[in-house]
Regions:
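Short, glycine/acidic-enriched loop or turn micro-motifs at the edges of active sites
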Residues: 12, 63, 87, 220
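Nucleic-acid-processing active sites and adjacent nucleic-acid-binding tracks
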Residues: 24-52, 56
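Anion (oxyanion) recognition and catalysis
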Residues: 74
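Gly/Thr-rich phosphate-binding beta-strand-loop-beta motif of the actin/hexokinase/Hsp70
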Residues: 2-21, 109
């Protein structure tokens, strides 16, 4: 079956769409980033898709704005690919694209899909997506709590102040502290409801260095990698997905830069893995000590 690629540049309010099949390319307009807009896109695609092609959506991850659209695409049984924005930018430069507009970006995504034929991705399991949201909310609460505690520490060193300001900071600390306990209890209860996640957490926790602070983030990351590669990924690809693959820069004998990591993946997971490795190195019986030495 032939494939009809849809390149979509998605923003908070709307998105631009371009179709590409064989040698035919067509911009089909701008649509609202909401269920009505998704339906209007479907109507426009159906008018073009007279040969009953397989639909393959190509879009860049844009915070959370793309999530509703991607869920809709899976409901329509479309194939979906979410290439790394850095990869798309570099690919576009290689194609000689010098202009950046929403319409050009949609054109680039459709052309990338048509020429590179990226593998379709699976959707992330709903219960993993919900766990991920709770983990992110916990991080947000911890950040707000830390900020308020820093404000309190700064406040007590002031020579002047007000009782209202002091009490407001104390109230905020109490509020965020209670919220943190609540979301932690919710995560614990959620894992009891989903024994598959609980068992996988136990297995990951057996790896030296992976503790309670990072194990669930790493578990979600592995699920996301599995979905991104349709369960066909390998170890090298996983390392690259985290942005830990080596970035070499040398040419003959005249050009050489110290190798670094690419940092093209999720910076949060790199921080989590770094802290896990650091913790693993501190344990006397950890095999990481012998490995690194």
């Amino acid at each position: 079956m032939k494939t009809l690629f849809i390149g979509c540049d998605i923003s908070k309010k709307d998105f631009e769409a371009t179709l590409r099949a064989d040698d035919v390319e067509q911009s089909i307009g701008t649509f609202k980033t909401n269920p009505h807009g998704y339906g209007e896109l479907r109507k426009a695609v159906d008018k073009f898709n007279k040969a009953d092609y397989q639909i393959h959506l190509i879009a860049e991850p844009t915070g959370t704005y793309h999530l509703g659209f991607i869920a809709y695409a899976y409901e329509q049984e479309w194939e979906v690919s979410l290439p790394n924005p850095v990869v798309i930018r570099q690919w576009a430069k290689g194609q000689g694209v010098r202009i950046k507009t929403d319409k050009i970006d949609a054109h680039t995504l459709a052309a990338y899909g048509f020429k590179e034929q990226p593998a379709a991705e699976n959707s992330l399991p709903t219960h993993v997506e919900e766990l991920d949201l709770m983990l992110k909310r916990k991080d947000d609460i911890k950040k707000s709590l830390r900020q308020e505690k820093n404000r309190l520490e700064s406040y007590v060193h002031r020579t002047t102040g007000s009782d209202a300001t002091h009490q407001s900071i104390l109230d905020a600390i109490a509020f965020y502290g209670a919220q943190l306990l609540e979301i932690q209890a919710a995560i614990k209860s959620y894992l009891k409801q989903h024994q598959d996640l609980a068992k996988q957490r136990t297995l990951l926790s057996a790896v030296p260095g992976i503790g309670e602070q990072g194990v669930l983030k790493i578990l979600v990351f592995l699920y996301r990698w599995d979905a991104r590669t349709a369960s066909l990924g390998n170890a090298n690809g996983l390392v690259a997905f985290a942005g830990l693959d080596p970035a070499l820069h040398s040419s003959s004998t005249s050009v050489y830069r110290r190798p670094t990591i690419s940092k093209m993946g999720d910076s949060e997971i790199r921080r989590t893995l770094y802290m896990s490795a650091f913790g693993g190195m501190k344990a006397k019986s950890s095999p990481l000590v012998d490995f690194c030495q």
